[in-house]
Amino acid sequence: MGLLDGKVALITGATRGIGKAVALKFASEGADVAFTYLNSYEAAERTVREIEAYGVKAKAYVSNAGDFAQAHDVVKDVQAEFGRIDILVNN
């Protein structure tokens, strides 16, 4: 039983560095993880597979966090796909 079982996290910029480390840690604690990326579809797909290896749900969304309309759309899409957002990490 993980600290974040049943929670949904949205993390911006999680295909590398701190964002990816946070995504993997949250997944290891039981959170489903939605995350954004800007350029590399391949890196996003690798990250999805790494997160899913923890037995949780993962989905990548291409989005520029600096663009308000795109950020708004991602929030709506994540809520539709996951039902809610419990944790937000703006990386």
Question: What are the residue ranges of the model-derived segments?
Answer:
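Aromatic pocket-lining residues of Rossmann-like dinucleotide-binding sites
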Residues: 26
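A glycine-rich helix->loop->beta "capping" turn
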Residues: 5, 54-57, 76-90
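Structural signature of the Rossmann-like NAD(P)-dependent dehydrogenase/reductase core
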Residues: 11-12, 90-91
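Conserved glycine-rich cofactor-binding loop
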Residues: 8, 15-17
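The beta1-alpha1 cofactor-binding region of Rossmann-like NAD(H)/NADP(H)-dependent oxidoreductases
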Residues: 41, 62-76
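Conserved glycine-rich Rossmann-like NAD(P)H-binding loop of the short-chain dehydrogenase/reductase
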Residues: 29-46
